[in-house]
């Protein structure tokens, strides 16, 4: 904890000369931001987002799927989940972060698993919103949809797909520099905005996007990353919180989003970028910790360091771990011999939670900390995480 107090009050991250004032201001700002953030997300959740909560007995698990790492089995699982979610969600597409994760998952589905079908749906989605991000200028949640816009732009090269999200990020980069109010104050934001900036760099060749992303990433990391556990606190209000067993409170889903953001940034970052080794090191540190606390069923509980307190796995976080670990192995960043057994066990665990209709269960609803949910709870962002995981597992199977 001393590391975090020191970082929060570091002269490079604040203007106030008083450490106590700096820390108190940061905690108050973060607490208010959390309240505002959750309030903004508290709108009624439609059936396309939350489709769970039915008794498990009335929803039989799928019997036509296998968790084996073969092309045939991985693609079949991806199709089943993607088809079910697309059929339910397309009439209710949204610009918010929950759907942005789903869209990234649809974009990741390989051609061999009917990827074009889902990309075509994403093109229809983008046209529906005129390729605009969400309404909040500086909020990373409303920028995350830009990942899909930019991935489509790289295939189709229609300027309409690029211009609005580029203008949004240009505007964000012109906001006043308030180092005592980090732009990305919650760890999930590292999935939302950084990949957009990294993709803009790749597309435009303008390094300002990558440099801005790099600066903001390490400001957030210095505040929320625990160098002892190699995990991220959800936000500054969690720095002093503990599980019932005395361990720090580290949220599975939040850390999953961070690891997914890490690999999506690394996918765009040049190998000679000066700070790239820091991202690789952070991925390797987090991967080692995550592998060491994997559950017997291959999955991870909502509170990472007190798994016995949570009866169900949390599959959106678990899927993002599979995605990041598989990407690391596929790209030579993580040792195959060490992590392949972890991935195999985790993928089989995820597939075991797919129901006959195609939904994937055990997904915690919107929140900011470990919470309760049913085995059938299913949300669009969890589906997106599963499809992203499948895309890398399918590569691994090759």
Q: What are the language-model segments listed below?
A:
Residues 40-42:
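Boundary at the C-terminal end of the N-terminal hydrophobic targeting segment
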Residues 47-100, 107-128, 132-146, 152-156, ...:
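CBM-like carbohydrate-recognition segments
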Residues 187-191, 198-304, 311-322, 334-363, ...:
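Extended ligand-binding clefts on enzyme/binding-domain cores
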Residues 22-35:
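Bacterial N-terminal signal peptides
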Residues 1-20:
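N-terminal secretory signal peptides that target proteins for export/translocation
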Residues 162-194:
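Asp-box/WD-like beta-propeller blade repeats and closely related beta-sheet repeat scaffolds
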Residues 90, 114, 130-134, 157, ...:
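Helix-capping and short linker residues that terminate individual alpha-solenoid repeat units
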């Amino acid at each position: 904890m001393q590391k975090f107090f020191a970082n929060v009050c570091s002269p490079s991250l604040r203007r106030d000369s008083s450490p106590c004032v700096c820390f108190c201001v940061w905690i108050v700002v973060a607490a208010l931001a959390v309240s505002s953030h959750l309030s903004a997300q508290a709108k009624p959740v439609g059936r396309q987002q939350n489709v769970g909560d039915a008794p498990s007995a009335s929803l039989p698990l799928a019997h036509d799927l296998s968790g084996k790492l073969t092309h045939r089995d991985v693609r079949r699982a991806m199709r089943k989940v993607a088809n079910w979610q697309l059929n339910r969600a397309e009439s209710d597409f949204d610009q918010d972060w929950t759907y942005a994760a789903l869209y990234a998952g649809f974009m990741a589905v390989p051609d061999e698993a009917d990827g074009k079908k889902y990309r075509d749906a994403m093109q229809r989605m983008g046209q529906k919103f005129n390729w605009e991000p969400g309404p909040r200028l500086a909020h990373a949640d409303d920028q995350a949809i830009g990942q899909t816009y930019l991935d489509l732009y790289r295939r189709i090269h229609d300027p309409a797909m690029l211009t609005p999200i580029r203008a949004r990020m240009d505007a964000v980069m012109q906001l006043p520099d308030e180092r005592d109010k980090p732009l990305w104050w919650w760890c999930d934001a590292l999935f939302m905005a950084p990949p957009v900036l990294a993709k803009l760099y790749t597309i435009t060749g303008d390094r300002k996007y990558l440099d801005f992303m790099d600066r903001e990433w390490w400001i957030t990391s210095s505040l929320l990353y625990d160098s002892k556990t190699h995990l991220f606190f959800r936000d500054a209000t969690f720095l002093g919180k503990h599980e019932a067993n005395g361990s720090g409170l580290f949220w599975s889903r939040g850390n999953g989003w961070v690891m997914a953001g890490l690999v999506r940034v690394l996918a765009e970052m040049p190998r000679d970028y000066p700070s790239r080794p820091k991202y690789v090191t952070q991925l390797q540190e987090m991967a080692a910790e995550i592998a060491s606390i994997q559950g017997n069923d291959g999955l991870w509980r909502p509170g990472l360091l007190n798994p016995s307190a949570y009866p169900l796995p949390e599959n959106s976080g678990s899927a993002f771990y599979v995605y990041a670990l598989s990407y690391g192995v596929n790209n030579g960043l993580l040792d195959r011999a060490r992590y392949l057994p972890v991935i195999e066990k985790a993928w089989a665990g995820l597939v075991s939670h797919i129901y006959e209709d195609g939904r994937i269960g055990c997904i915690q609803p919107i929140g900011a900390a470990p919470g309760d949910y049913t085995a059938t709870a299913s949300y669009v962002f969890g589906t997106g995480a599963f499809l992203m995981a499948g895309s890398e597992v399918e590569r691994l199977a090759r």
